[in-house]
């Protein structure tokens, strides 16, 4: 697959890469990019959306708020994360994180990985 990505890809090749089970997800990016990450849970109203990860992180020495859609690697993880589709709790959680970023003057880094 890596060799093929170095050449011109057809539209169908791009779709296949986007759907590939082993492509990086938010957890991979957090592990590879962040020196540290403190995940925050819940929307402070109803509950926590497992389809959205967010929290405080350090990337390249810079403190940031990180928000991203979470997809699982298998069926069970996908069901737990609602296949990466945010619920109302997830949108409230994202708003909570963005308000915290504004309050503390931190940049927001977002990873959008939604189905469809």
What are these regions (language model features)?
Residues 1-116:
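Terminal-region recognition feature
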């Amino acid at each position: 697959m890596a060799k093929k990505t170095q050449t011109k890809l057809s539209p169908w090749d791009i779709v296949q890469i986007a759907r590939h089970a082993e492509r990086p997800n938010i957890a991979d990016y957090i592990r590879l990019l962040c020196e540290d990450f403190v995940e925050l849970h819940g929307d402070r109203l109803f509950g926590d959306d497992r389809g959205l990860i967010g929290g405080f992180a350090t990337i390249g020495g810079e403190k940031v708020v990180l928000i991203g859609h979470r997809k699982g690697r298998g069926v069970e993880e996908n069901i737990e994360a609602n296949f990466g589709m945010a619920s109302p709790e997830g949108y409230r959680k994202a708003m909570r994180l963005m308000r915290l970023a504004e309050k503390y003057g931190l940049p927001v880094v977002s990873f959008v990985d939604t189905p469809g």
